[in-house]
Amino acid sequence: MLISQSWLTRILQTSNPQWSVSAEEFDAGFVRVGFETEGYEAIPETTGPLVIGRVEKIEELTEFKKPIRYCDVNVGQANGTGELQHIICGARNFAEGDNVVIALPGTVLPGPFEISARKTYGKISEGMICSAMEVGLASQQNPGIMTISDADLASANLKVGDDARELLGLQDTIFDVNITPDRGYALSARGLARELASSFDLQFRDPAQDPAAAAMRNDLFAGLPGTDGEVQALKVDEDTKCSKFGMRKVTGIDPQAESPLWLQRELMLCGQRPVNPATDVTNYVMFLLGQPMHAFDADKVTGELHVRLAKKGEKLTTLDDVERTLDPEDVVISDESGIQSLAGVMGGSTSEISEATTNVLFEAAHWDQITVARTCRRHKLSSEASRRFERGTDAAIIEDALDFAVALLVNIAGGQVEEGRTLVGAVPEMPMITIHTSLPGKTAGKIYPDGTTISRLREVGCEVRETGSRDDNGAREIEVTPPTWRPDLTMPADLVEEVLRLEGLEDIPSIVPTAPAGRGYTPRQRMRRNVGQALAWAGYAEILPTPFIANDVFDVWDLPADDPRRLTVKVQNPLESDYACIGTTLLPSMIESLRRNVTRGQRDAALYGVEQVSVPKSAKPFSPMPSVKQRPGAEELQELLDSLPAQPLHVAVVATGNRQLQGTWGEPEAFTAADAIESARVVARAAGVEITVRNAEYLPWHPGRCAEILVGDKVVGHAGELHPQVCERAELPPRTVAMEMNLDALPLEETFPRPVLSAFPAVLQDIAVVVDEATPAQDVEDALRAGAGELLEEIRLFDVYHSESLGEGKRSLTFSLRFRAPDRTLTEEEASKSREAALQFATEKVGAQLRA
């Protein structure tokens, strides 16, 4: 929030007349009570003759592409001669007789921009008529020149030719205070002044009830008519969650009136552009008290105002001239002619204040925080009002805000306040929180003086009552009721934070506890680490799969309707509506990542990811969220636990293109289904388990090039080549391969005894066998392994050969066999006997014949 140091200082000086600090101390004061400032900046200095002038004559120059005015301006004796200054200006919002700010030759405006007499548009221009931005009061260009009323000059005891700096308040500093979402009360001068009073140990008078405390006229509220009776018929529907709604009315204002300079200045320094007195008053009250308001042109409101939920398809053109289609969850204010406002966010254009408005209806309300936040998100629309309603406002000051608004408007634009006030609803009841006074000290590890907790909570604005009870250490029990402007205080921890914040977070001792002895990784963590390292060493690049998958991905895969992978967890408020499901498999995310790599030119890619998936236990919807006001009961907790999905840890691999690139070492080698199966073996070795593979049909894999991975008799994953249609629909090259395994299904303890490491040499032999084309290579390998006996240490398939000479429907499989004895040097004869035994057993089991 942007706010000037002078505004906050004036509020605090009403109770502390002599108080004043530097900008650096001001900044430190914010930090001391837990508020960060994005920065602070003094209004840029203007040097030289910056004076008040009066426009005496305007000559319109029409021979140029845009309208130009040649003005005669009276600057008194400021120019040393008393003669009129002749100044060229392109702005159109001032007239003869208006008081303006003049930068005479020799003035250096912020920029720096030096003013000198020079010829332009065929005339000599002897200075500049300034806008608010040009003198440093506004950060954005305001439409036109800044004019000063005679009343502003009289109140400051100034005349034409006098220096304008003091009137403009150019000796000031602007602070940009970072307000966290839980502290909506601080989005106001009232809230920040209260915090600074605590920081500097000052007295504080609440400006909500006392105009003098807001550094305004003591008699501002004097003469306000009574509030008996209604000024506007009103109906508030209960389902809108509007707890309080109030209105007051002003009639007969001067439609040509302008806001005084002091009001325009405060708004500009808060980053708000002055518009007209009625709108400026609502913005000023919002920045002063933190209560957003809206001003209706009362003559454009017909019949009863109705606070209700929008109907589907209703439309509203908001003040930013955008037509919006409303949602049934949006809260609106309507009358007999239609919708007039999007509640808590922005008013409608049909009843906005115009240059002809003479009767104004002010509205102030207390809207539901969540409803306003969802409306803003839904319409991608944010405003100063919605920022405050989203964070929570003070329902207790609605009447005060209305009184401020009507009194200020009458003071500025004339007219009279209509007797009566429409008020529906009441201030929501604040929760009572019970704590012991020792809790802040226990939390901080610091002993605070007796009474600190009570005094600090009262300083925040809480009502504190001692119950008379004490804990075992003698600490008093107190019942605390937070103030209405602090809806964020709901539990003991919130009260502890307030005490520690005001006592000084920097005073809490920084004592590092003794770290317990490390126990290392758990077996599951060790498995995950080993698997990741093994795949990385095998040449795969790690990615972090997103848990969200496209709603239609399983339709793209043509999965059967009864496939259990279709039963997914649905997210109620997804980041993207097309990705509202939490995956039961990692492959959709892996395939999408591979697609992005391929489309960006990475044709040869091998990726792996290790992440949890979510597998619902049933199609039953989740239990509703429990209340946060109390701990859930045992039955409610069990129901919640039963409804949570299982979240097994999966590992997945996808690869496409060439496994080995072309080079001096040889021709390129493409990824095949065998590489996907080998990645499963890499995972198994890293996890310390033994797997087997066999043919399978399992989408999204190719039905003839898919293997299921087993540990014992349990299927733990699949690997192979993706289905051609899946590749085409996913925009992947043909013959892309993939593997996915359930790591949680792998046993933590090895299912086979660790082999004894032998120091004796191994004997390597190869064997080539001819088998039927339909015989799985795994079956042949298993038969050879079983027949070779205990001397066989490793068997590996390294060649598959097809030829007409082998016979129709035949193929050759060549295996490398490694034999080793644990207690002696193995001879070639012994190894050959084991090889012959392996061949004989394979012949009996799978019909394998030794290849000639």
Swiss-Prot record:
Compartment list: Cytoplasm
InterPro entries, alphabetized: aa-tRNA-synth_II/BPL/LPL, B3/B4_tRNA-bd, DNA-bd_dom_put_sf, Fdx_antiC-bd, Fdx_antiC-bd_sf, NA-bd_OB-fold, Phe-tRNA-ligase_IIc_bsu, Phe-tRNA-ligase_IIc_bsu_bact
Location of the B5 domain: 428-510
Main location: cytoplasm
Reactions catalysed, as given in the entry: tRNA(Phe) + L-phenylalanine + ATP = L-phenylalanyl-tRNA(Phe) + AMP + diphosphate + H(+)
Quaternary structure note: Tetramer of two alpha and two beta subunits.
Family of this protein: Belongs to the phenylalanyl-tRNA synthetase beta subunit family. Type 1 subfamily.
Protein name: Phenylalanine--tRNA ligase beta subunit
Species in which this protein is naturally found: Corynebacterium jeikeium (strain K411)
Gene: pheT
